[in-house]
């Protein structure tokens, strides 16, 4: 049966399944006692878009992703969670069910999953790796026997999640199925970052997989991977260049008229940039009604 929307305006996505899977199986990181992982609403929106499917071709709409937010927003837990999802969950499109909704199958039914958490230094990989390992302390260990988390690798029932900090030359040909490229504003020509990014993307696309970058603000003119990705996404959106699949460019900063010297203006700018994670008592400024206050202390950012 072909795609059949259940309501007007609905688009096909495996994102609803992914969100349910994350909440059911993953633990919230950085807490003393187990709590289920619960993404913020804007994180949910990113996942729904990331797993959106073209109803005519069955391909994912987006071939690459870029999730840009300020430090502390929560990029690392959400991307660490997606590493686990891509390693274990049913995220390879496998047709439509009897109701015309998309269904998936795990990578392990197609090929051996190989997920990479990549950066240009060991410390940078830990930004995503450490919360990811904590998320594996939840029910996922009982549901998927054979998952074994270690300092630099997570063994899977079939496949692995690995850290990757080596040069572009040494990753050539790795059968990657999904990769997170962490802090790509630091991936510059002098440390081999662009070469590493190119090799990882090439390896991943050859296997039908995808990559997501998680940059902080980049410095224009540095030639970083983050800068180049932003330029490519903008050019494609404006019709100045053609790419096989669009880049999901989800990036938000404070409004350009934010006055850094005026407290109220600065607080309002931080509420915009931090979105749902802002702990402002008025809740978030993105949604109506607003989401409840999040975890980021805005006063500490001033």
Functional labels for PLM-detected ranges:
Residues 1-302:
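Phosphate/NTP-binding elements of NTP-utilizing enzymes
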């Amino acid at each position: 049966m072909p795609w059949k929307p259940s309501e007007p305006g609905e688009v096909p996505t495996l994102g609803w399944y992914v969100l349910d899977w994350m909440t059911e199986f993953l633990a919230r990181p950085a807490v003393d006692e187990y709590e289920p992982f619960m993404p913020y609403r804007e994180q949910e929106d990113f996942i729904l878009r990331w797993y959106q499917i073209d109803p005519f071709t069955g391909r994912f709409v987006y071939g690459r992703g870029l999730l840009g937010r300020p430090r502390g927003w929560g990029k690392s837990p959400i991307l660490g969670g997606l590493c686990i999802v891509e390693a274990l969950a049913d995220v390879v499109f496998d047709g439509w069910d009897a109701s015309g909704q998309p269904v998936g199958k795990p990578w392990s039914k197609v090929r051996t999953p190989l997920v990479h958490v990549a950066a240009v230094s060991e410390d940078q990989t830990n930004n995503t790796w450490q919360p990811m390992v904590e998320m594996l302390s939840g029910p996922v260990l009982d549901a998927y026997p054979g998952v074994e988390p270690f300092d630099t690798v997570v063994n899977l029932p079939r496949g692995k999640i690995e850290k990757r900090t080596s040069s572009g030359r040494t990753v050539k040909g790795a059968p990657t199925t999904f990769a997170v490229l962490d802090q790509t504003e630091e991936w510059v020509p002098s440390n081999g970052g662009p070469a590493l990014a190119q090799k990882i993307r090439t390896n991943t696309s050859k296997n039908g997989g995808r990559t997501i970058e998680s940059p902080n603000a980049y410095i224009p003119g540095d030639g970083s991977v983050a800068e180049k990705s932003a330029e490519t996404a903008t050019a494609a959106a404006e019709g100045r260049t053609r790419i096989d699949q669009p880049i999901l460019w989800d990036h938000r900063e404070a409004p350009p008229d934010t006055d850094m010297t005026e407290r109220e203006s600065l607080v309002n700018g931080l509420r915009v940039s931090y979105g749902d994670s802002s702990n402002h008592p008025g809740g978030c400024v993105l949604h109506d009604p607003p989401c409840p206050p999040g975890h980021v202390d805005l006063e500490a950012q001033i």
